[in-house]
Amino acid sequence: MLAALYYVLKGDPYKALKEDLESLKKAKLLTEDLRITEKGMELIQQLISKPISLKGKVVSGDGEGRYYLSLEGYRRQVREKLGFDPFPGTLNVLLDPTSTEKKSTLMFKRPIILKGFTENGKRYGEVLAFPARVSGVEAALVIPLKTHHPPEIIELISPVELRKALKLKDGDEVEVLVY
């Protein structure tokens, strides 16, 4: 599961992993034999307990979120696991470069897994969900394990239409707090 999450978050897993390991060693968070240092453990504890702030600009999607959130297999799981009935659509955000890098720290959070299912003979894949807030409004950042979005695009679901509730249009800047 962690490998799949890493791939979705970072793109090329081997290149990204090698770069990340080198930067962790330089920062004295890992030893040369890849053991987590005391400083590394302190950082992990901070990452687990604090919300992650991601910033970017609202962008239009292709409407696929509306389709997937109309499927009862996903709707039921969102109600049961996230505690809200999702608006049938997603808010797409193009992350700034710093937030795109910070997105990889989601691997330290425990995702809520929306399990894949079969409906009308078609297979739908797993989705990782992370509770979030956008300008104080309840939401969840969702990461389908099969997606066509590049790593710098995130999708948010909510019990309300986020564009309307927050009066957002393409190009507006938003901050997403992921818990």
Curated annotation (Swiss-Prot):
FMN binds at residues 147, 155. Its cofactor is Mg(2+). CDP binds at residues 61-66, 160-163. It comes from the Archaea. Mg(2+) binds at residues 90, 92. Belongs to the archaeal riboflavin kinase family. This is Riboflavin kinase. It comes from Ignicoccus hospitalis (strain KIN4/I / DSM 18386 / JCM 14125). The lineage of its organism: Archaea, Thermoproteota, Thermoprotei, Desulfurococcales, Desulfurococcaceae.
